[in-house]
């Protein structure tokens, strides 16, 4: 018994000794007392049309790094990545575009100052195949020359026009002011002419029209007569605000229209609501069966604009990520050679008094008149500004311009779709056309 007590005492003393020894000789836990130093030697490699790789020296005591980007100037930076390594590959950039970057290191205590700021310009993307340019043309009143002047000025760059001419009623009767000058000039200068037919955004008109075969046939006969009489080369169907349950009837109408017009040598095209997936019961886009409609159309125009719209919350007209997602989905069901990307040439001014639309030039004038600074949102790749009017009412303005258009044209080239459709001719400015000519090598 005494033996076991002595053994137990020995083991206890030994354990205390070992624990004390480890405590005495163990390296103390270093507690961070300050944020890390700023990263150094920020450089870039592998620059291409739409990507670049950033590298910098590792920072002692840093847990990770935060990467910031701005375009086109050294201001208004956005955090684009939080990473653990000292290298970052930035993808989905626009070609031929200037970007600025800096990096910060961070740990549990805080964040470092900025690294040096660097800038670079991505490689230029030029289409290797001819891209088609369609322009929607309007003629709102006698003497309205806005679209005509744009057609005449940019004839060498425009391949097609779709004149916003006809509105149908519930029974297939069409009416509208025919832009004879636009049609005559375009036909004389090798620009294809299409007669646009709309339902005036009225789902009830479309419901009565599409759900009745007699009404559909009346409309088809009236369209055929109108394009023959006025010298059009085809038609563009722009039915919007449709009820999702009229999906099969819209498809039936396009099938009947195509089988009537196409054998006679007329083009059949249509504009469809933008969507990122097919949801047949979606309120705004459910009526459009992309896959089947493509069978009965020579061209499909994706209306990739009004992502934020009058009456809604302020925001980008067409953010680049949304536009790209729409294209990606469309390409799963529509042949790329039939696909046109809708591009906007306008802006919206939101306030508590409602929303107003402006041309690109008018938007710049609006900013100048109120001394507003135009800013750039690097997430949506869109310009915007805010101001207060004489009554003290706050306004938020988002618009499209040549710079934001560049990003869309890069997508057209990257995904090799057929081209673009501009809403609308007369709202754009010279820089807008310069972007088109440069990106499409026109």
Q: Residue ranges of each PLM-predicted region?
A:
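Sec-dependent N-terminal signal peptides of Gram-positive bacterial secreted proteins and lipoproteins
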Residues: 3-27
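Pro/Thr/Ser/Gly-rich low-complexity, intrinsically disordered linker/stalk tracts
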Residues: 28-61, 95, 108-127
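Recognizes extended acidic, P/S/T-rich segments that occur
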Residues: 66-95, 108-118
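Glycan-recognition patch characteristic of GH18 chitinases/ENGases
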Residues: 125-222
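Conserved, mostly hydrophobic/aromatic
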Residues: 161, 237, 300, 341, ...
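Substrate-binding surface in catalytic domains of secreted glycosidases
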Residues: 171-173, 244-370
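Glycan-binding loop/region signatures in secreted carbohydrate-active enzymes
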Residues: 338, 343-411, 437-442
């Amino acid at each position: 018994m005494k033996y076991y007590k002595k053994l137990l005492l020995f083991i206890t003393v030994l354990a205390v000794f070992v624990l004390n020894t480890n405590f005495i000789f163990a390296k103390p836990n270093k507690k961070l007392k300050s944020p890390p130093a700023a990263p150094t030697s920020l450089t870039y490699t592998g620059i291409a049309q739409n990507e670049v790789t950033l590298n910098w020296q590792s920072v002692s005591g840093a847990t990770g790094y935060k990467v910031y980007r701005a375009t086109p100037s050294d201001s208004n930076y956005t955090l684009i990545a939080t990473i653990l390594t000292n290298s970052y590959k930035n993808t989905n950039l626009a070609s031929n575009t200037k970007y600025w970057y800096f990096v910060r290191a961070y740990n549990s205590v805080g964040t470092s100052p900025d690294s040096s700021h660097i800038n670079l310009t991505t490689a230029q993307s030029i289409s290797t195949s001819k891209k088609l340019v369609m322009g929607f043309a309007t003629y709102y009143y006698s003497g309205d020359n806005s679209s005509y002047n744009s057609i005449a000025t940019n004839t060498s760059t425009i391949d097609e026009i779709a004149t916003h001419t006809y509105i149908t009623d519930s029974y297939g009767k069409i009416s509208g002011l025919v832009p004879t000058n636009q049609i005559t000039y375009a036909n004389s200068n090798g620009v294809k002419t299409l007669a646009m037919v709309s339902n005036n955004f009225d789902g009830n008109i479309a419901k009565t029209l599409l759900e009745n075969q007699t009404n559909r046939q009346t409309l088809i006969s009236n369209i055929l007569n109108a394009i023959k009489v006025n010298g059009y080369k085809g038609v563009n169907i722009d039915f919007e605000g449709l009820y999702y349950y009229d999906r099969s009837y819209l498809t039936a109408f396009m099938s009947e229209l195509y089988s009537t017009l196409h054998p006679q040598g007329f083009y059949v095209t249509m504009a469809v609501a933008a969507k990122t997936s097919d949801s047949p019961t979606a309120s705004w886009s459910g009526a459009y069966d992309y896959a089947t409609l493509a069978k009965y159309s020579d061209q499909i125009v994706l209306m990739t604009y009004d992502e934020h719209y009058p009456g809604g919350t302020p925001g980008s007209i067409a953010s680049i990520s949304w536009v790209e997602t729409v294209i990606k989905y469309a390409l799963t069901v529509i042949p790329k050679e039939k696909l046109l990307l809708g591009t906007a040439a306008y802006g919206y001014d939101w306030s508590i008094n409602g929303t107003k639309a402006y041309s690109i030039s008018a938007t710049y004038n609006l900013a100048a008149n109120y001394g507003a600074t135009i800013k750039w949102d690097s997430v949506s790749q869109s310009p915007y500004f805010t101001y207060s009017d004489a009554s003290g009412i706050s306004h938020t303005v988002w618009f499209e311009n040549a710079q934001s258009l560049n990003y869309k044209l890069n997508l057209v080239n990257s995904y090799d779709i057929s081209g673009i459709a501009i809403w609308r001719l007369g709202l754009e400015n010279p820089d807008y056309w310069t972007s088109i000519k440069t990106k499409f090598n026109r």
